[in-house]
Regions:
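A beta-rich soluble binding module of mature secreted/lumenal proteins
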Residues: 2-205
């Protein structure tokens, strides 16, 4: 009984403790190969509303959540990120990007195309702290129908990646394909994490 209670307390403590951004770091930034020809159809991308965000590496999820909440990472619990984030995105042709989640919060970013790479763009918040979640994002894989994978370098000098989708969940075959792809880029399997939408209001899974 004692050991079971102790385990329960440890699990609870882990769930309510603040985020440790340093422990979520995967590896320093590295170069993303430029496609021989553009792979992302922008008209399709701008038509997807909302964009769900079910798969990414841990550091990306933590930074996106902290930036949306506008809080110190130590004041954001791990459990709130996985159960309350409900992250979605909207992207517009004028460069405006909105992240939404945590029961109605919204954060605005401005993006600019990278001249020599049509599958890349820079992004930073319109106001507030700019060194939490900004940088250059590169589209590395997409079917231009249901998902796209983007990777980039955070201001912390650490590499991040995430998957935008048209639905809250991904088919297993698609997920497998994406995981194989990000590993081939140099990311680590152990740092892959999933965001669940089961408990999100107004989102049908």
């Amino acid at each position: 009984m004692y050991s079971a209670s102790l385990v329960a307390l440890l699990c609870l403590a882990s769930a309510i403790q603040g985020l440790d951004l340093r422990s979520s770091e995967e590896q320093p930034c590295f170069d993303i190969p430029k496609p021989k020809s553009p792979i992302l159809e922008m008209d399709w991308l701008f038509s997807v509303k909302p964009i769900y965000y079910p798969l990414m590496n841990t550091i990306d999820l933590y930074h996106a959540s902290v930036d949306l909440l506008q809080k110190n990472a130590r004041d954001v619990s791990t459990s709130s990120v996985y159960y309350d984030a409900c992250l979605t995105w909207e992207m517009f042709s004028n460069g405006t990007i909105f992240s939404k989640g945590f029961n109605g919060l919204q954060r605005e970013y401005i993006s600019k195309a990278v001249e020599d790479n049509p599958d890349a763009f820079t992004m930073e918040p319109v106001d507030g702290e700019k060194d939490v979640y900004s940088g250059t994002a590169y589209t590395t894989l997409t079917d231009n129908k249901t998902f796209f994978v983007q990777a980039g370098c955070l201001p912390s000098g650490q590499m991040a990646w995430g998957v935008g989708t048209t639905t809250p969940t991904l088919p297993e075959e698609t997920k497998k394909k994406i995981i194989e792809h990000v590993i081939s880029l140099g990311f680590k399997k152990d740092d892959i994490t999933e965001l669940k939408y089961d408990t999100c209001k107004d989102i049908k899974v």
